[in-house]
A protein has these predicted regions:
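Conserved "HGTGT" condensation-loop signature of ketosynthase/thiolase-family condensing enzymes
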Residues: 6-129, 155-156
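Short acidic/histidine-centered micro-motifs embedded in hydrophobic/aromatic stretches
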Residues: 73, 136, 193
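Short glycine-rich or small-residue beta-strand-to-loop segments that form or flank ligand, phosphate
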Residues: 131-138
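Intrinsic, low-complexity polybasic segments
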Residues: 2-3
Length: 209
């Protein structure tokens, strides 16, 4: 409710809740043993390539890794990825993603739609009940058009939608915007989705990354 309140009255605060959540899990697993094998092969190739510079002292030799090193440093035992072959290729060590035609849903929107449908099911809602979609990510697949619009189409939502990029705090800012929209009455059911392809962010060739 907008406007000025008469003296002695109290504003009724709209209660905002998170009614459902969903989580997309990539289809492929890379174990520490697999990653170490690929990384150490990369180290061998690089040290061989730069042998003269390493011998002259102008370039340090790359150090190999181990399963024990990874687990002690991070506690990580395995990770889920969208593409496994590219990451484990010692001559590449980053994922391969095929460009999709414009008439297909984008990769990040597909991931987001999967998690969104899980969240809707958990909340007991349908896409038609969603009147705003906020797609928040630290690293967007593209600048425009908004992936939120693709997500709307994929789940059958109407209303409005837009993308947000606030680096590592994108999701928290989106949750705040969603809560504010409900409190302001511009939306009654807001979907916040945070698709991140983190395997494409990492420098797999850096042992300490």
């Amino acid at each position: 409710t907008g406007g000025l309140l008469p003296p002695g009255s109290f504003a009724t605060m709209t209660r905002v809740v998170i009614s459902g959540t969903g989580l997309y899990r990539p289809p492929h697993v890379i174990t520490n043993a697999e990653l170490v094998e690929a990384f150490n092969a990369y180290v061998g190739l690089q040290n061989e390539k730069n042998a003269a510079a390493i011998a002259a002292g102008s370039l340090p030799a790359l150090a190999p890794s181990s399963v024990e090193f990874i687990e002690k440093a991070s506690g990580i035992q395995q990770r889920y990825v969208l593409d496994k072959s590219g990451v484990l290729d010692p001559t590449r060590m980053y994922p391969r993603f095929q460009e999709r035609p414009d008439d297909q849903i984008s990769l990040m929107a597909e991931i987001a739609a999967d998690a969104s449908n899980q969240a809707l099911a958990a909340a007991g809602k349908t896409g038609a009940q969603v009147d705003a979609v906020l797609c928040a990510s630290a690293n967007m697949q593209r600048a425009y058009p908004a992936m939120a619009v693709e997500i709307q189409q994929a789940i059958g939502a109407g209303g409005y939608g837009f993308d947000m990029n606030v680096a590592c705090s994108s999701a928290t800012f989106a949750i705040e915007q969603a809560a504010n929209a409900v409190r302001a009455g511009t939306a009654t059911c807001v979907l916040v989705v945070n698709p991140e392809i983190t395997s494409a962010h990492l420098e797999w060739r850096d042992r300490d990354c």
